[in-house]
C-alpha cells in the first residue's frame, strides 16, 4: 500500500520546487529565543536539528495536544508527525540557506506521547519518514530512526521529532 507519490529525483530539480508541486509552503522556522540552546547546530557536515513539536505548528488543522491512543487518533498523530517534519525542513532551510544542500537525512527520532497500551508508535512516526522519502527520494530521504512512546511531553503535545541531516558545503 503506497500512501504517497514519490517524485522522480534528478540532480537539476530543486527541493523547493518539488515542495511547491506537492502544494507545500514552508512555515516559519523554529527559532528559539534563548542564549543556552538553539534549534539547530552544525558540526562538520552534519546539522543536528532540535525537537519540533505539535505545539509549535502554525496549522490549525493539526492536533496539538493530547495522548495518542486516547485523545488523538493514530491517523491524526501521523498527520501531526508530517507537519512537524515540514516545520523541520523550514528550520533546516533557515540554518543552511537552501534545501538542495541536504545530501542525506541521517536519522530522525520521534517521541510519541501515548497511552501505555498504544503499540503503533512506528506508524505514527511514518508521517515524518514518508514525507522525507517523498520529498528527497530514496537516496537522500531514506534514514535510520527510532520511535519511542513516552508518558508525556511539554504542553501535552502528541509528538515531538528531531533529526540529523548531512549537508554539503556551500
Show where each model-derived region lies:
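N-terminal presequence-like segments and the immediate start of the first folded domain
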Residues: 2-86, 90-109, 114-170
Amino acid at each position: 500500500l503506497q500512501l504517497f507519490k514519490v517524485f522522480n529525483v534528478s540532480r537539476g530539480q530543486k527541493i523547493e520546487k518539488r515542495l511547491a508541486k506537492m502544494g507545500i509552503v514552508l512555515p516559519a522556522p523554529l527559532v528559539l529565543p534563548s542564549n543556552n540552546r538553539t534549534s539547530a547546530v552544525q558540526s562538520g557536515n552534519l546539522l543536528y536539528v532540535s525537537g519540533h513539536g505539535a505545539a509549535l505548528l502554525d496549522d490549525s488543522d493539526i492536533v496539538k495536544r493530547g495522548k495518542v491512543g486516547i485523545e488523538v487518533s493514530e491517523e491524526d498523530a501521523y498527520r501531526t508527525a508530517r507537519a512537524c517534519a515540514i516545520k523541520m525542513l523550514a528550520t533546516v532551510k533557515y540554518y543552511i540557506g537552501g534545501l538542495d544542500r541536504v545530501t542525506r537525512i541521517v536519522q530522525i527520532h520521534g517521541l510519541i506521547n501515548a497511552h501505555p497500551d498504544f503499540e503503533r508508535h512506528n506508524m505514527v512516526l511514518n508521517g515524518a519518514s514518508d514525507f522525507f522519502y517523498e520529498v528527497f527520494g530514496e537516496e537522500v530521504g531514506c534514514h535510520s530512526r527510532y520511535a519511542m512512546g513516552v508518558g508525556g511531553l511539554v504542553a501535552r503535545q502528541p509528538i515531538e521529532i528531531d533529526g540529523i541531516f548531512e549537508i554539503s558545503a556551500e
